[in-house]
């Protein structure tokens, strides 16, 4: 155990240039490359980026602007979210704010129509 502690102390004392040289020497000695894991990790990310091309199933409804009928919008927000009066008022006055997350397309469109019928500007993402 003392040998490992001594090794850690010696490695900690290396300069950046010495550490880089050590890294190259170890790569040659062990036949590995420090760059390989980066390339491997990048491949799944590209696959994940292609996945959103499929049809979206969960949507987020965002109140962009309350509009002229703020009281009616607050009432609808309370009905949709189950928030209390103060919380719903804060949400409406703090627009743009998320009203509901993870809803299906039909529910998102229903919420959007309810709010827009009361003068609000709504985005579905």
UniProtKB/Swiss-Prot annotation:
GO MF term list: mRNA binding; structural constituent of ribosome
Signal peptide segment: none
GO cellular component, one term: cytosolic large ribosomal subunit
Keywords, alphabetical: Ribonucleoprotein, Ribosomal protein
Subunit: Homodimer. Part of the ribosomal stalk of the 50S ribosomal subunit. Forms a multimeric L10(L12)X complex, where L10 forms an elongated spine to which 2 to 4 L12 dimers bind in a sequential fashion. Binds GTP-bound translation factors.
Gene name, Swiss-Prot/TrEMBL: rplL
Annotated organism of origin: Gluconacetobacter diazotrophicus (strain ATCC 49037 / DSM 5601 / CCUG 37298 / CIP 103539 / LMG 7603 / PAl5)
Cited function: Forms part of the ribosomal stalk which helps the ribosome interact with GTP-bound translation factors. Is thus essential for accurate translation.
Name of the protein: Large ribosomal subunit protein bL12
Protein origin, superkingdom: Bacteria
GO process terms (BP): translation
Record family assignment: Belongs to the bacterial ribosomal protein bL12 family.
């Amino acid at each position: 155990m003392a040998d490992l502690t001594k090794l850690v102390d010696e490695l900690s004392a290396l300069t950046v240039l010495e550490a880089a040289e050590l890294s190259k020497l170890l790569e040659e000695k062990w036949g590995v490359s420090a760059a390989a894991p980066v390339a491997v990790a990048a491949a799944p990310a590209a696959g994940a980026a292609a996945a959103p091309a499929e049809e979206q199933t969960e949507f987020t409804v965002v109140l962009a602007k309350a509009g002229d009928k703020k009281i009616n919008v607050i009432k609808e927000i309370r009905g949709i979210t189950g928030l209390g009066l103060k919380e719903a008022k804060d949400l409406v006055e703090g627009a743009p704010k998320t009203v509901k997350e993870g809803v299906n397309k039909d529910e998102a469109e229903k919420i959007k129509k309810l709010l827009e019928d009361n003068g609000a500007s709504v985005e579905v993402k």
